């Protein structure tokens, strides 16, 4: 199996649907994109970038995807990000998440599992999933406001070696949100990043460390991409930020 390769939207649309069974309801990528595009047009939104990371079978057939749609905003530092996860082989439940991204590095920010609307591929999963795409776009402005305020507050929080070791260690040893490969990326970023401060800089902040870590999360597998970002943000929330309860998505048909 090949994991974390990039694919185009057309490749995802062209991937053949699996056969439906009594115990399985496919959620077509084509319908997901139609619903996303409908919300983008309806909201007058401008897409800055789209990225689709996929897992494939040994024969090169796409089986799972984590998609990120980056949306422009008037903010000079951050944009909005809409994410979805889907699979054609039962390896992943369908999921929707909303968050943000940092312009200069395109690192993602997912505040909580608030839009981790998860749905196994059964019953009315196809229609429910499309409703939750609508709900995600309806709530993205409110969530984005919270995220930008939180990210700005991280800039005011100094991080020393002890704090860095504690946070990175928790993500690696306790939560398994970063792998050994990603740990090395974090280490390299802390000393050699050309976008954020280094660990030995006197003004090294939680914002800098956050972005060093999320740079490594670009290597997360589609199955864990959302939860790895959630774990990272929640850890920083608990350490540095006073939070409110995240927005909730509808989880079933009315």
Predicted regions: what they are:
Residues 41-69:
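A short acidic/basic microdomain associated with nuclease active sites
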Residues 1-37, 44-51, 185-194, 198-199, ...:
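Feature for intrinsically disordered/low-complexity regulatory segments and propeptides
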């Amino acid at each position: 199996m090949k994991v974390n390769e990039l694919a185009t939207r057309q490749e995802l649309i062209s991937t053949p649907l699996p056969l439906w069974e009594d115990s399985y309801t496919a959620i077509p990528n084509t319908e997901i994109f139609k619903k996303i595009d409908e919300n983008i047009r309806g909201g007058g939104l401008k897409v800055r970038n789209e990225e689709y990371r996929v897992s494939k079978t040994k024969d090169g057939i796409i089986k799972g995807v984590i998609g990120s749609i980056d949306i422009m905003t008037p903010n000079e530092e951050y944009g909005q990000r809409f994410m979805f996860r889907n699979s054609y082989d039962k390896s992943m439940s369908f999921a929707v998440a909303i968050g943000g991204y940092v312009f200069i590095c395109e690192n993602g920010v997912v505040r909580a599992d608030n839009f981790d609307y998860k749905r196994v591929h059964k019953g009315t999963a196809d229609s429910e999933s499309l409703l939750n795409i609508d709900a995600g776009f309806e709530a993205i402005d409110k969530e984005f406001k919270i995220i930008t305020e939180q990210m700005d507050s991280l800039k005011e929080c100094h991080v020393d070696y002890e704090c860095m070791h504690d946070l990175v260690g928790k993500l690696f040893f306790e939560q398994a949100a970063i792998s050994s490969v990603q740990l090395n990326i974090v280490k390299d970023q802390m000393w050699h990043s050309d976008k954020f401060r280094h660990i030995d800089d006197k003004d090294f902040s939680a914002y800098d460390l956050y972005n060093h870590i999320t740079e490594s999360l670009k290597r997360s597998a589609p199955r864990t991409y959302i939860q790895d970002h959630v774990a990272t943000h929640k850890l920083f929330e608990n350490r540095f930020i006073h939070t409110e309860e995240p927005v909730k998505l509808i989880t079933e048909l009315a």
